[in-house]
Amino acid sequence: MNKKTRIAITGPIGRMGRMLIKEIQNNKHSHLTVAVVQKKHQLIGQDIGRIIGIGEIGVLISDELNIKKNDFDVLIDFTRPAGTLEYLKYCNKFKKNIVIGTTGFSKEEIDIIKSYSQKIAIIIASNFSIGINLLFQLIKKTTQIIGKDSDINILEYHHRNKIDAPSGTALEIGEVISKVMNWNLNQDSIYYQKGITGIRDAKKIGFSIVRAGNIVGKHTVMFSSYDEEIKITHTASNRMSFARGAIQSALWIHKKNTGLFDMTDVLSL
């Protein structure tokens, strides 16, 4: 009988953390063993299951200083860049693999993550839903066929509390398009603002961003020519698709030794 993969979660009290824990407990191949919060958090020592409303599960909330080597097999982290880099240090120290769903990293921070992947296995993705990763493939194919004849725009919508813009997923869509078109995303992007903007440059990707209400996530890519327009849209109804993808990633990476991976590796796309 195969042992369950023991998973540690950072930010367990947040919306994503709660969803992850519920899905971990429902997955027959995984179970939660560590729920990590910041130092001196008022809920340290309490049962995380009771706190998130699923009843006691025997896992007490702890801070990062209490992570022990034998507590977990894989860490799932959806926090902020500075926190992720600290958790990477722990994983590297204890030779534990990590799944990173945090977005908003700088180029320098990405380079740090890449350096850690020489010592442990890391999965990093802007979006863990299977649907959005299929969308990446559709965008790639569409760009190959009509990209040179289209104005391309990315529209992304998220809840009012999201602090980074554009979203990591929108930027990844932009990278998919840029690679096909041989563009530089940083140089070949348009962020729409008020005022006289001038005629639209054909060889750039337009970004439009909405932050409102409780929108989980919606991404639309428009390919517009003089004769027709194609829209490809993915809408997340809730965060469960992200949670399932992250846990699938944790199970996949458990036995890996080193390397930097993404959802195309997990899904064999």
From Swiss-Prot:
EC class: oxidoreductase
Residues binding NADP(+): 39
GO molecular function: 4-hydroxy-tetrahydrodipicolinate reductase; NAD binding; NADP binding; oxidoreductase activity, acting on CH or CH2 groups, NAD or NADP as acceptor
Binding site for NAD(+): 11-16, 101-103, 125-128
Keyword set includes NAD: yes
Family recorded in the similarity comment: Belongs to the DapB family.
Organism: Buchnera aphidicola subsp. Acyrthosiphon pisum (strain APS) (Acyrthosiphon pisum symbiotic bacterium)
GO biological process: one example: lysine biosynthetic process via diaminopimelate
InterPro entries: DapB_C (IPR022663), DapB_N (IPR000846), DapB_N_CS (IPR022664), DHDPR_bac (IPR023940), NAD(P)-bd_dom_sf (IPR036291)
Job description of the protein: Catalyzes the conversion of 4-hydroxy-tetrahydrodipicolinate (HTPA) to tetrahydrodipicolinate.
GO CC annotations, alphabetized: cytosol
Name of the protein described by the UniProt record: 4-hydroxy-tetrahydrodipicolinate reductase
Pfam families named among the record's database cross-references: DapB_C, DapB_N
Pathway: Amino-acid biosynthesis; L-lysine biosynthesis via DAP pathway; (S)-tetrahydrodipicolinate from L-aspartate: step 4/4
Assigned keywords, A-Z: Amino-acid biosynthesis, Cytoplasm, Diaminopimelate biosynthesis, Lysine biosynthesis, NAD, NADP, Oxidoreductase
Annotated localization: Cytoplasm
Record: residues binding (S)-2,3,4,5-tetrahydrodipicolinate: 159, 168-169
Subunit and interaction comment: Homotetramer.
EC number, UniProt record: 1.17.1.8
Known catalytic reactions: (S)-2,3,4,5-tetrahydrodipicolinate + NAD(+) + H2O = (2S,4S)-4-hydroxy-2,3,4,5-tetrahydrodipicolinate + NADH + H(+); (S)-2,3,4,5-tetrahydrodipicolinate + NADP(+) + H2O = (2S,4S)-4-hydroxy-2,3,4,5-tetrahydrodipicolinate + NADPH + H(+)
Main location per the UniProt record: cytoplasm
Top-level taxon: Bacteria
